[in-house]
Amino acid sequence: MAKGRVAERSQMGADHTTPVGDGAAGTRGPAAPGSRDYQKEKSWAEAGSARMSLLILVSIFLSAAFVMFLVYKNFPQLSEEERVNMKVPRDMDDAKALGKVLSKYKDTFYVQVLVAYFATYIFLQTFAIPGSIFLSILSGFLYPFPLALFLVCLCSGLGASFCYMLSYLVGRPVVYKYLTEKAVKWSQQVERHREHLINYIIFLRITPFLPNWFINITSPVINVPLKVFFIGTFLGVAPPSFVAIKAGTTLHQPTTAGEAVSWNSIFILMILAVLSILPAIFQKKLKQKFE
């Protein structure tokens, strides 16, 4: 008899249970794919993911900016005029003014100047802030050519790799939302050159076909390995850096950025770009021939 009562109560509970999606009870089940509610839920989820990514990115940026502040505070005591010139150069005049300040303290405070240059360059590259080209020019003014070239290549490789990792961690929603079409096109190009990807990245770094910031933030999304990305960037920025460093040796002269880069330099860059992609072309031709 007790069993009969339990069964009866269970049946009564079942009769009063509100089905999933019953509007009278105010509950809703998961929306069907393709429905308007499903699209709204998907949009809300994407917006929430984008907001969280932006919050993380801002936090990382503020932390990096604080590190830059500490680097600046560790710099030698500067006069008022020198402090005005201690800024990221936006043109050749700014680069010359900053070069004069740094060259004054370089011999006495060699490590501090080198660390400040290194940190600033990587900071700009990591967050895709314009101005690194003038720091490349400035390196030719401050340091011997071999050190300047190695320093610029290393800073470019590390900064671009940090940008890559930022995109991998928090930048995917931005790429998916705003750069989908361009990322898909570049993904197709990467797949064509997957067997010789280092040569392809070197070629892209030498040539102006794709902006560097676009390469940095989309590479992790389309599965370019970080090791290949770093090596290709380190080697690929060397030819343009060669031109910029050479221009830095004339920084004391009254020149503009356009005058500092000659047509001979541009011609050399074009030749190096072609040479960087030739191994991939020959490999593809040989493969087609033997197949």
Swiss-Prot record:
GO biological process per UniProt: autophagosome assembly; nervous system development
- Origin species: Pongo abelii
Asked if the record carries the keyword Kinase, the reply is: no
What are the subcellular locations of this protein? Endoplasmic reticulum membrane; Endomembrane system
Gene Ontology cellular-component terms for this entry are:
endoplasmic reticulum membrane; mitochondria-associated endoplasmic reticulum membrane contact site
List residues modified as Phosphothreonine.
18
- Name the record gives this protein: Transmembrane protein 41B
Q: Which GO terms describe its molecular function?
A: phospholipid scramblase activity
